[in-house]
A protein has these predicted regions:
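Eukaryotic acidic, Ser/Thr-rich intrinsically disordered low-complexity regions
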Residues: 174-223
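Structural detector for internal amphipathic alpha-helices that build alpha-solenoid repeat scaffolds
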Residues: 1-6, 12-15, 22-37, 46-47, ...
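Alpha-solenoid HEAT/Armadillo-like helical repeat scaffolds in large eukaryotic proteins
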Residues: 12-16, 43-51, 75-83, 106-114, ...
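Ankyrin-repeat and related helical/solenoid repeat scaffolds used for protein-protein interactions
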Residues: 137-187
């Protein structure tokens, strides 16, 4: 392929990212990811913030992961501070896929407790990928402040994030079980159950946790 031909393909793909058809936008993102070009990075990041189609957003993220982190991190780190929730969420999601720990300082307590559930869930996933080993316990403590939050998907996302940290979460879950609000206690108990039994269904773990909380502290129900 000549340089002129490549330049034309890049121009066509960048234009395709703004097409009214989601299938055209999807193909454009695929094309860019297949033949990465630094000139496309800014547009990919920009589109992540506003792209309405989930499949296209996933392809945009994939295309960004195909470029060198030195090129993608600056734009993505700027987006996590955006006022637009989708920009924050998709940037965090992409950072979790890139997995470059230079992004860790950008995962702030504010993002981990973001009022938007999608942003918070993306922040949790990114955090457990990027956190340095020596900060895992501190991260578990921050994540535990969100126990009991939201509906099923949000709670399951938080449980998975906590479980990904491993057994360092046990003291944190124990504290939440002993002193938390009922919803947080239920969530903490269910999360510990899933840590020890990954094959258990989340709904079953929650229902079991509700019974434990209703009866009192864990272990009392058999007394």
């Amino acid at each position: 392929m000549t340089m002129a031909t490549h330049d034309k393909d890049v121009t066509r793909a960048l234009q395709g990212l703004e097409d009214g058809s989601s299938s055209v936008r999807l193909r454009a993102a695929l094309t860019i990811g297949t033949a990465p070009d630094p000139r496309c990075v800014d547009k990919l990041v920009e589109r992540c913030a506003i792209e309405p189609d989930f499949s296209v957003r996933e392809m945009l993220t994939w295309a960004l992961t195909r470029h060198a982190p030195d090129l993608t991190l600056p734009g993505l780190l700027g987006e996590v501070r955006s006022e637009r929730a989708q920009a924050r969420s998709q940037a965090l999601h992409t950072l979790s896929k890139i997995g470059d720990r230079r992004a860790w300082p950008a995962i702030t307590r504010e993002l981990l407790s973001d009022a938007d559930d999608e942003v918070a869930r993306s922040a949790w996933r990114a955090a457990v990928v990027l956190v340095p080993e020596e900060e895992r316990t501190e991260l578990a403590d921050v994540l535990a402040t969100q126990l009991g939050r939201g509906g099923r998907e949000t709670r399951l996302s938080l449980s998975r994030a906590l479980i990904a940290l491993g057994e360092v979460i046990l003291p944190t879950l124990g504290a939440a079980t002993a002193k938390g609000a009922p919803a947080a206690r239920q969530h903490a108990i269910a999360t510990e159950r899933l840590l020890h039994d990954p094959d258990a269904a989340f709904e079953f773990a929650i229902e079991e946790a509700k019974r434990v909380v209703a009866l009192g502290t864990p272990g009392q129900e058999g007394q």
